[in-house]
Amino acid sequence: MQYNGKSQQSINKINCIIEKNQSNSIINKFQVASPYDDYDDRLNFLETIEKNSGFYNVLCELFLPNGYPDSVTTDYFGYQFWDSIQALCSTITGTLATRAILKGYGVGDSSATVASATTQWLIRDGMGMIGRIVFAWRKGTDLDCNSKKWRYTADILNNIGMAFEMISPLFSSQLFLPLSCIGLIAKSICGVAGGCTKASLTQHFAKRDNLADVSAKDGSQETAVNLVGMLLSVIVSSFINDNTSLIVTWLVFLFFTSLHLFCNYRAVSAVQLKSINRYRAYLIYDYFIHNQGSIPSPSEISKLENILFSIKELDIRVGVSLCNIYKVQQKQQKLNNQFLQQKLNNITKTKNVNNNNNNNNNNNNNNNNNNNNKNNNINNINNNINNNINNNINNNINNKNNNNNNNNNNNNNNNNNNNNNNNNNKNSLEIIKKIKKSKSFIIWKKHSQRGNKILEKDFTLLIALLNGSTTRDMIESYFYAVEYFHLSSVQIPPTINISGTFFKRLEEKGWDLDRALLNSEGWTFGI
């Protein structure tokens, strides 16, 4: 229970304080007496709101967390609805698989022995335990960040395991044990993946630190669904007996298996996780690029997610690899120099064309003047000749001066470019040194360092903000740029800069950012 503030409300012209529970339902009313009365008499109990004892409210109290729907996230009902249906289908198919396994053990066969059945049962259980341990060792760290994917994969493996159990009695006794072991291994992996991801999803649904309550009510829902599934399984088993054809049995199994996969997909798709893994980060940046800098919400990204087949190689690269930062900078500088050189060549060509046109026009004008002035006196001819000579001399002098100035400018530009290259290279080396010494950054795959050599594969996607204003300014242009281009392109590659407000906007949209590696002043974004 909680008190919904201390505001007073007027009900039937009586000042009172209303007490509400977590589901925002009124449970008690207290009359507010005069402030001049004694302290003990200021609050008078007015009435208690009796709870509705209807069947619907009883079901809500039995199977829904306390305070529903305010105590859980908005996607809770959609997930639980489809998850309950898929659990029902799984119970029915599990009954058919168990029936096939018992038949393979020799139930109903007078020649079968108890010792043989016990030995086979123990071997199956042992193989399942080994498969559970190996899977937890290999994929345990991936279950948290890809909980939706593994939640759906777990049910696929469960169906594969039951399919192997269904076909195992159809073969000889020598193949029954290996096929049934494969089926149990798949179901054991489903138990690990499904159980771990279920815990992760339950933590997501628990909105008010009510993880235990949400988990307990989820267990109650699952138990009730299993009871209903057992009743339906008894009905299905009564129609499917030893005299039923194999085709009918498999049609029933495939129908409930398909329905199980469909409902499970709808359940996982309804979940709107707010944590950011590598795949969801790719979708966020892709949405950011193609929607003019707008930030997507968790519900929008949930609609774009491919649950089962996530991309393996990302065509958007955030920043540059730590090992390739120097090489990428050199390639970028070469592209810039090529672009500037091409621009200077075009400008020089246009200037030369203009100068040639001007000289041709001057020559034509001089010829016309000479033809028109043939009948003039000798003094005018001498003056024209002298003027032409002086003009040519001056033009030559000006051209030489212009050429010298252009050469000087080109030399200055080359010197400036060389100085910039040297400065950039020094900055790049300083960045690498500071990043190697710092621990305030996170990488997508793992923290791995063999000796003093940083492995390139461990720095595939990195977003960092280190301590110190100098370091921040130095690395900002490298790690806060989304580069979606190929370096072999002749054109200057486009970039979209992401400032520090980008991550604040992510938080405003409801995304949860992992800040476990926070330092005193810097902060880190990642998974």
Swiss-Prot record:
Glycosylation sites recorded in the entry for this protein: N21, N243, N346, N467, N497
Main location: membrane
Keyword Hydrolase part of the UniProt annotation: no
Disruption-associated phenotype: No visible phenotype.
Transmembrane parts of this sequence: 220-240, 245-265
Keyword Membrane assigned: yes
Subcellular location: Membrane
Entry membrane topology: Multi-pass membrane protein
Keyword tags: Glycoprotein, Membrane, Transmembrane, Transmembrane helix
Protein family according to the UniProt entry: Belongs to the RUS1 family.
Protein name, entry field: RUS family member 1
Organism: Dictyostelium discoideum
Lineage of origin: Eukaryota, Amoebozoa, Evosea, Eumycetozoa, Dictyostelia
Encoding gene (name): rusf1
